[in-house]
Amino acid sequence: MTKRPTRVSLAIATCVLLSTGRLSTAGAELGPKLYFDPCPPFAPEMTFDCYHDFAEVEQFLRDAAAAYPELASLESIGKSYQGRDLWLLTITDRSGGDPSDKPAVWVDGGVDADEVVSIEAALGVVHRLLTSTDPEVADLLKRRTFYVAPAIIPDTSELHMRTPERPRDSTLRPWDDDGDGALDEDGVEDLDGDGQALTMRRENPNGDWTPSEEDQRVLRRRRPGDAGPFYERWTEGIDNDGDGEYQEDRPGGVDPNRNYPGNWSIGQRGNGPFAGSETEIRALMEFAAAHPNIAASQHFHSSGGVVLRPPSVPDWQLPQSDLDLYLRLAERGLEVSGYDLATSVYDWSWPRGSGNRKRGQIWRNDEGELKGGLSRLDGYAAYGGSIDALYEIFGVVAFANEIYQMGEDDDGDGRIEGHEALRWDDEELDGRAFKEWEPFDHPQLGRVEIGGWRKFGQNNPLAEDLAEEVRRNVDFVLMQARNTPELAITKLEAVPLGGDVYRVEAEVANRGFSPTELAVRTQSGRAVPVRAEIGGDGIEVLSGDNRLDLGVLAGHSARETEWVVRASRRSELELSAWHPKGGRASSAVGIGTE
């Protein structure tokens, strides 16, 4: 049961609500879409210069499926905590075979609440696949299937788009963050009525923050010997429950990207009551389990302009062959995306890069060349993430692109610090990403200043920069699709042995770049072998079984096999090869006599 605010807090909250017209809490009724005009409808000529709210995402997907019924089908794979549909669009050219018989790529967005550019990138994948006139895209759709789920956690994405709140990464399952027995009782408020709940600061000689020497607008952590001034800081809002803390129990509390049942940890903050506890994450995992043809995945996030791969633990825990595959694909990913860094989650120094490059990282130097770097001992363990889960459990080559780099590394230390981001905002964005500090009379704290980074421009690009980010990330997904495993029958011959007996000689190849199974699956005993099977009317197999297991096929490799058969009459011998991630291939040869 949610604890009721004190009488004083209720009075203050009422005052704030009347003065701003909004009170941003999980239980509040959502207002209209903020910040952007309605987005134009789905159309071949549309451009991505608008952020979609959930209703517009739904309409986009319905329109896309209706416009291209031969390529796209729309379904809901589950419900969010608040009951919104988790929409998924299956895209493939069915004239090339059943969707489940082709190697597939999973694409999702909207997992982290304030990273709404990820939704646009996923919609961009849909748009490119359906509307492109490029023959290579048409050919890819004959040979691949795409499963695109643009809005995995729509409840909190809606908070971002339709309330002043910049929500944390969370589902909207209520959670007692501060352990007081109440749930979600102290959220944020837009006190100054500018449409966004930003940051408050107040001078205090005991504060932990002080202005940066590089730019006084930026607060950095206090160091020994600092002279001040010193500040306290909070997210904009009031103390709703009268406990002396501010915004310590905001809406939700379970981080969906720490709730996946891959490398999940009981000690990870935001992990939830148990692995896969959240309805949205469970729906995704159940879909993946039911679709073993998913060979690659892209889980869009923001920001940093970084290509992330597993693991969320040190690289030595990854099988070497899998690590080698990831490094080669990541390097190609940097080439097609133009981003500057590809790294494991563990070795990524959030938010903008790593000052001491690791051997497992690939990065772009000042001349634009892609390089590998030196070793580093420290790391960032983020347990229960999507790419670890898809990789570990299902053997999927999973990437997570952190879309959009805001600013430049002016001093070459491998990071984009706050003052460097502010310079970029001043010079390139005309100051639209950062609100200058302005005084405000807080009903509880007294005189404070309100300002800081706005919702768009820092973590999500401004609308005019959105299309380029969408383009480069769609290119990355198509690169992933081109490099999945893909089975082909490269040889099928029937050699007469005398009478009506023949030796059937066959070769099954993986003409894709990736192996049919990753080493992580082989080591865990979960690998599925490539299977080859012969048959036909009047065909009798004399040696062995008509169905053979060919094991795992590495990328660009082939395996020969043979059978001895009897053909009692003239008929057609058929050979089929299948692997869930490599697809289905078939061929036939005439055999026997009249």
Which residues does each PLM region occupy?
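Bacterial N-terminal signal peptides
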Residues: S9-R22
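Surface-exposed loop and adjacent secondary-structure segments within mature catalytic domains
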Residues: L30-D37, G78, I91, T145-Q268, ...
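Short helix-loop-beta-strand segments that form the rim/entrance of peptidase-like active sites
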Residues: S118-R162
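Short amphipathic, basic-aromatic surface patches that mediate peripheral association
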Residues: V508-Q523
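Intrinsically disordered, low-complexity Pro/Gly/Ser/Thr-rich segments with frequent PxxP/GP/PP motifs
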Residues: I539-S568
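Short, aromatic- and glycine-rich surface loops/edge beta-strands on solvent-exposed regions
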Residues: S571-P580
